[in-house]
């Protein structure tokens, strides 16, 4: 057998054996409290490395089980949560997270573990329309952490409606009364995942020097109708949506200039208090109740007002690296989606790993653990490795995957 053929045969056989081992590890036996031991972790690292290099196509499932946990203490330990601040810098700069979710519990649980730090605080808003099973699972998870809580008021969230913005604001209001001295609030959805460690996020936000991060511009042509016409939320058990009417809206209050931007932002505590109390913010919220996707104009419009705490100048544009998103209409720029599109946004597949790893953004959107498990697993492993490498304290054995 020629050497080149022999080499190809050996590589092929090895690949098949590794795949079988992975399959058995993934689906064999009771998966409650399944965790990566040393050999599993090494195996996953090798698989991820190969996949990023475009050499392998593996299926991997390392399910983080939340249900039927015997105790919070055991769950926190066996799920490898980090239970102590890793540096004084992070202690001195706690973060607040707003997490608005409605389904896909496993993906949310991975996000929560990835961003969890004991010095931070977490407000979780569960869609009022979510199933009882989902609500119960989230409540059970959150109850294990003294620095996490459910929003005091839950909204039945409608895609594109005011309820989505109101869900964020409900958490912002709850967080404003927290004794945790958080510096910035970051809003997320259940299909986000961090690309940077907590320390890296802290250092990035410290660099803003109190400025709020609300990427956005003056409305392009396709977005003008969102605030020009009256919109109505339609809410039912079968289908919820926003409809556009032919009625024109009055001008915005206080002669505000409306901007169009990202629904995902990083807000200083001072700005959060302004949003809750200042008449301009309160009136803009009321005016926005019958617009389309008000979360995409509310934050950026307020943050362009001169003199507002942490405001950015009108020409700030899309400044900031909050979210890595692959839009369907921008394939020429990002190279295409290797998963599939939903609402014009890529659900990341395994082939997107290299692009995600190269991104300078703090977070990426969107992920589905049950559809593309390896994508989340590889990012999670890489993030934990960097997190522990940056630690300035002794690392507990349970923090390793």
Curated annotation (Swiss-Prot):
Compartments where found: Golgi apparatus membrane
Enzyme class, broadest EC rank: transferase
Keywords noted in UniProt: Glycoprotein, Glycosyltransferase, Golgi apparatus, Membrane, Signal-anchor, Transferase, Transmembrane, Transmembrane helix
The keyword Transferase is assigned to this record: yes
Reaction equations catalysed: a beta-D-Gal-(1->4)-beta-D-GlcNAc-(1->3)-beta-D-Gal-(1->4)-beta-D-GlcNAc derivative + UDP-N-acetyl-alpha-D-glucosamine = a beta-D-Gal-(1->4)-beta-D-GlcNAc-(1->3)-[beta-D-GlcNAc-(1->6)]-beta-D-Gal-(1->4)-N-acetyl-beta-D-glucosaminyl derivative + UDP + H(+)
Segments on the Lumenal side according to the record's topology features: 29-401
Membrane topology designation: Single-pass type II membrane protein
Gene Ontology annotations for the cellular component aspect, listed alphabetically: Golgi membrane
Domain of life: Eukaryota
Matches recorded under Pfam families: Branch
InterPro entries attached to this UniProt entry: Glyco_trans_14
The EC number(s) this enzyme carries: 2.4.1.150
GO BP annotation list: positive regulation of cell population proliferation; positive regulation of epithelial to mesenchymal transition; positive regulation of ERK1 and ERK2 cascade; positive regulation of phosphatidylinositol 3-kinase/protein kinase B signal transduction; post-transcriptional regulation of gene expression; protein glycosylation; transforming growth factor beta receptor signaling pathway
Pathway: Protein modification; protein glycosylation
Cytoplasmic compartment segments: 1-7
Any GO MF annotation of the entry: acetylglucosaminyltransferase activity
Regions that span the bilayer: 8-28
Glycosylation sites: 37, 255, 315, 389
Record keyword Electron transport present: no
Family membership noted in the UniProt record: Belongs to the glycosyltransferase 14 family.
Function: Branching enzyme that converts linear into branched poly-N-acetyllactosaminoglycans. Introduces the blood group I antigen during embryonic development. It is closely associated with the development and maturation of erythroid cells.
Name of the protein described by the UniProt record: N-acetyllactosaminide beta-1,6-N-acetylglucosaminyl-transferase
Native species: Mus musculus (Mouse)
